[in-house]
Amino acid sequence: MPRYTVHVRGEWLAVPCQDAQLTVGWLGREAVRRYIKNKPDNGGFASVDDARFLVRRCKGLGLLDNEDPLDVALEDNEFVEVVIEGDAMSPDFIPSQPEGVYLYSKYREPEKYIALDGDSLTTEDLVSLGKGHYKIKLTPTAEKRVQKSREVIDRIVEEKTVVYGITTGFGKFARTVIPVSKLEELQFNLVRSHSSGVGKPLSPERCRMLLALRINVLAKGYSGISLGTLKQVIEVFNASCLPYVPEKGTVGASGDLAPLSHLALGLIGEGKMWSPKSGWADAKYVLAAHGLKPIVLKPKEGLALINGTQMITSLGCEAVERASAIARQADIVAALTLEVLKGTTKAFDTDIHAVRPHRGQVEVAFRFRSLLDSDHHPSEIAESHRFCDRVQDAYTLRCCPQVHGVVNDTIAFVKNIITTEINSATDNPMVFASRGETISGGNFHGEYPAKALDYLAIGVHELASISERRIERLCNPSLSELPAFLVAEGGLNSGFMIAHCTAAALVSENKALCHPSSVDSLSTSAATEDHVSMGGWAARKALRVIEHVEQVLAIELLAACQGIEFLRPLKTTTPLEKVYDLVRSVVRPWIKDRFMAPDIEAAHRLLVEQKVWEVAAPYIEKYRMEHIPESRPVSPTAFSLEFLHKKSTKIPESEDL
């Protein structure tokens, strides 16, 4: 029998339908009838017939025709909103689609699983879980650890031992002993009272990461959660039922209490929840629509769900993966700019970097060689200026290995810390089953990921800083020898004039965002928690910095490709031509001014989805595998003694006569 969940004036009603041929209008009237039945004053209606209403889908808020049959208009268990004529939309009714921050494709229910053991999760895995590519299951070893850990908690409760967070209050109330009869109530109160965050909800991708990471930490077996409860949490994740988690409210010690409490609040069937099937609705109805029941917390389980650094580190995983992606692609974009500006490749000579062998610097120089080696990848643009009188390029071109290189090394350093953190137990107290006891400690303190993510923001920002200067060189005719702002009929057309201003604005904003949040601390919880990390803000602003970097490089990518138009019919190297073709598949050349924002967004999408890297990477790896000797063209810019000797001894043509 089909059943629908209907929202009427703040009330959620389950309405079964015995005949699928009944109409949307019938569903609305039946929902209103049930609403009136539950109200002492009939909800202000004399009868159901007096009600005038519209029916909308909760997901997308699409308006439905009252005459359409239910089996045509709706799916079983779908969520709908009945809007009474004269009423505004219910003030507590949240828009059905949370604000997106990722430019990824729409959710499709995954078929593959990732087995979590609490020890081997990678940042790549967590981001894939966030995108909805996988479901979760536990390894047998993890299940055994969780069971043994829970046995310790059960024994503490049975023996009425006084242990923090299990039989006592929290924070300032740590010395308040709670009666056994109220231990479960204690856990529910903890979750409800700590759900006090503010701001926009996390996107589905980020909420999935947060939930998946909490599952991974619980799978380590040091938190005392029962196996049954943990499996319920996994079922919620696999159904993509995602609680409403405000992005603001954590100080990063004791863990990320507010956001994780909101996460747990949805699991117990309270607050709001979102799923691809339902949109936003009350958590208990979203769970019911997926055949799930709210979790009933046992002693210690509320604390087990909310104490840890998972908000910081889940966002940190996204930050480090996006930083890695844009850092790789920044080399490709800069190489294309160098070609357009007719720069020299000699600054990327292996001997230069062998005497200063930072790993990132060496790798960036190699990537430039693999893309620009004109012997391996003939470039008509490079040939056109092989014997020019330019001695060396500006720092923004010549020093890319040194500037981009340290960004790569920064990312590697941060990734190591984040990888350790996502596989760490950050609860308190910790349950050590092998010792049969609990120990209070400070693993919940977010200083490690907070400091690392502040460092990440500072490092990655430099990619935008140097990119903006390259955009200036592309747009400035005195530096590029190209039309001003990369457009014909300058004056009538403004070209990239304001796109460059946008890049400058983003770089300036990043300079403020790069101020470390982890240098701040405020005493909280009546001075019990008297030093905190502010890691939540470190993670959120790192992501903002990275997004700005992506957008600046998107503008540079567009500008470099537009510069190519003024060098035609000359061709660049094969890999860079492939990059040009990729960009032109989504953004056409500028013949005259047009609405530019969609083009910047399209280029940004290419970078976020790593399409630029996918096009160039095969050429880079082929170059690496073949160990191709680098090109050292005979050119004045290389200071070749052999060339200078030939030049000084060559007989001028006029003397041949």
Curated annotation (Swiss-Prot):
Disulfide-bonded cysteines: none
Q: Does the keyword Repressor apply?
A: no
- Report the InterPro entries cross-referenced here: Aromatic_Lyase, Fumarase/histidase_N, HutH, L-Aspartase-like, Phe/His_NH3-lyase_AS
> Which keywords has UniProt assigned to this entry?
Histidine metabolism, Lyase, Phosphoprotein
**5-imidazolinone (Ala-Gly) cross-link located where?**
253-255
Which residues are annotated as modified residue Phosphothreonine in the UniProt record? 396, 637
- Pathway in which the depicted protein is active: Amino-acid degradation; L-histidine degradation into L-glutamate; N-formimidoyl-L-glutamate from L-histidine: step 1/3
In short, the EC number is: 4.3.1.3
Gene Ontology CC, one term? cytoplasm
PTM per UniProt?
A: Contains an active site 4-methylidene-imidazol-5-one (MIO), which is formed autocatalytically by cyclization and dehydration of residues Ala-Ser-Gly.
An annotated Gene Ontology molecular function: histidine ammonia-lyase activity
Q: Which residues carry this modification: Phosphoserine?
A: 635, 648
Top-tier EC class: lyase
Q: Which GO terms describe its biological process?
A: L-histidine catabolic process; L-histidine catabolic process to glutamate and formamide; L-histidine catabolic process to glutamate and formate
Which reaction equations make up its catalytic activity?
A: L-histidine = trans-urocanate + NH4(+)
Q: Which residues carry this modification: 2,3-didehydroalanine (Ser)?
A: 254
Give the UniProt family note. Belongs to the PAL/histidase family.
Q: What is this protein called?
A: Histidine ammonia-lyase
Taxonomic source organism: Bos taurus (Bovine)
Lineage of the organism: Eukaryota, Metazoa, Chordata, Craniata, Vertebrata
Q: Which gene encodes it?
A: HAL
